[in-house]
UniProtKB/Swiss-Prot annotation:
GO MF entries: GTP binding; GTPase activity; metal ion binding; rRNA binding
InterPro entries for the chain: G_CP_dom, NA-bd_OB-fold, P-loop_NTPase, Ribosome_biogen_GTPase_RsgA, RsgA_GTPase_dom
Region (Disordered), start-end ranges: 1-33
Cofactor note: Binds 1 zinc ion per subunit.
Top-rank taxon, per record: Bacteria
Residues annotated for GTP binding in this entry: 160-163, 214-222
Protein name: Small ribosomal subunit biogenesis GTPase RsgA
Keywords (A to Z) from UniProt: Cytoplasm, GTP-binding, Hydrolase, Metal-binding, Nucleotide-binding, Ribosome biogenesis, RNA-binding, rRNA-binding, Zinc
Cofactor: Zn(2+)
Pfam families the record matches: RsgA_GTPase (PF03193)
Binding site for Zn(2+): 297, 302, 304, 310
Classification of source organism: Bacteria, Pseudomonadati, Pseudomonadota, Gammaproteobacteria, Enterobacterales
Length: 350
């Protein structure tokens, strides 16, 4: 990160945050301003409860408290923070986060109990990792793509473990991937084992903040380790879940720097995107090849299934839309309805 002096606007934000803090400090005293130094720029590389690890402009990492006036703080947030003074007594952290800059994007996931939760900020692209083993699932890829389109974050499809394919298998998989290439998605074929195809992936990651998404078994961690180098292997930092819902462990999202440039946020929150909180219209919009046919159906309330005069189904029959994608569209809608039914049943059971 380059070291930047705070602009007047940023300084005003710090001061305004301070004034709000003064008005809301009756419940519990906040930290004394005299314990901290001058404001500086930083990026959150991880969040742990009411603490955050902030990387300063010179690359050092500081464990910071978070002002109570900050309502949302996640990995990837760019912040204004202040270092703790060496003489500060009773403060076991190195600084405090004062303010959060406006986000360019935010990655969220639905939660049955807390609604839609942010899990990472300022993401440039989502790398959808799939593999031929344990199974190449286009349905899972399509689910991730719908989530990317809804979040308005650029996706890249990465197919791992291509070293396990023979010539015939490679031809078949390429035909499957052509479905996505033909509608404008970038597809990269790689092997974390042999490192085939890693160079184009490195180039796609350079200068951008990425997050890797993929189900268990696709080699996401192995791929990240190969890209980060052995000295920066992804480690799981288990923290206990005290939700009262049983014994669970989770891992905190963390930002890493690639040696070739660019950053990656590794988060367990994107192993699988839930789509049940979306409306059917949002799922339809998430299939980019449908866009040219929306509004052309005979009936305004067309479900794009067996409805007479459905322009999307006609495009499928004419070979303009891949039948596999059309089938997965309806599978997603069906799975959403099932999850919502279970959620509604659970709500009425409380």
């Amino acid at each position: 990160m380059s070291k930047n002096k705070l602009s007047k606007g940023q300084q005003r934000r710090v001061n305004a945050n301070h004034q709000r803090r003064l008005k809301t400090s009756k419940e519990k005293p906040d930290y004394d301003d005299n314990l901290f130094g001058e404001p500086d720029e930083g990026i959150v590389i991880s969040r742990f409860g009411m603490h955050a690890d902030v990387e300063s402009a010179d690359g050092d990492v500081h464990r910071c408290n978070i002002r109570r006036t900050i309502r949302s703080l996640v990995t990837g947030d760019r912040v204004v923070w202040r270092p703790g003074k060496p003489a500060a007594e009773g403060v076991n952290v190195k600084g405090i986060v004062e303010a959060v800059h406006e986000r360019t994007s935010v990655l969220t996931r639905p939660d049955f109990y807390d609604g839609v939760k942010p899990i990472a900020a300022n993401i440039d692209q989502i790398v959808i990792v799939s593999a031929i083993l344990p199974e190449l699932s286009l349905n899972i890829i399509d689910r991730y793509l719908v989530a990317c389109e809804t979040l308005q974050i650029e996706p890249i499809i990465v197919l791992n473990k291509i070293d396990l394919l023979d010539d015939e298998g490679m031809e078949f998989v390429n035909e499957q991937m052509d479905i996505y290439r033909n509608i404008g998605y970038r597809v990269l074929m790689v092997s974390s084992h042999t490192q085939d195809g890693l160079k184009p992936l490195e180039e796609a990651l350079t200068g951008r903040i990425s997050i890797f998404a993929g189900q268990s078994g696709v080699g996401k961690s192995s791929l990240l380790n190969a890209l980060l180098g052995l000295q920066k292997e992804i480690l799981t930092n288990d923290v206990s879940d005290n939700s009262g819902l049983g014994q669970h462990t989770t891992t905190a999202a963390r930002l890493y720097h690639f040696p070739h440039g660019g950053d990656v946020i590794d988060s367990p929150g994107v192993r699988e995107f839930g789509l049940w909180h979306l409306e059917p219209e949002q799922i339809t919009q998430g299939f980019v090849e449908f866009h040219d046919y929306l509004g052309l159906c005979k009936y305004r309330d067309c479900k794009h299934d067996t409805d007479p005069g459905c322009a999307i189904r006609e495009a499928v029959e004419e070979g303009k839309i891949a039948e596999t994608r059309f089938e997965n569209y309806h599978r997603i809608l069906e799975s959403m309805a099932q999850v919502k039914t279970r959620k509604n049943f659970s709500d009425t059971d409380d």
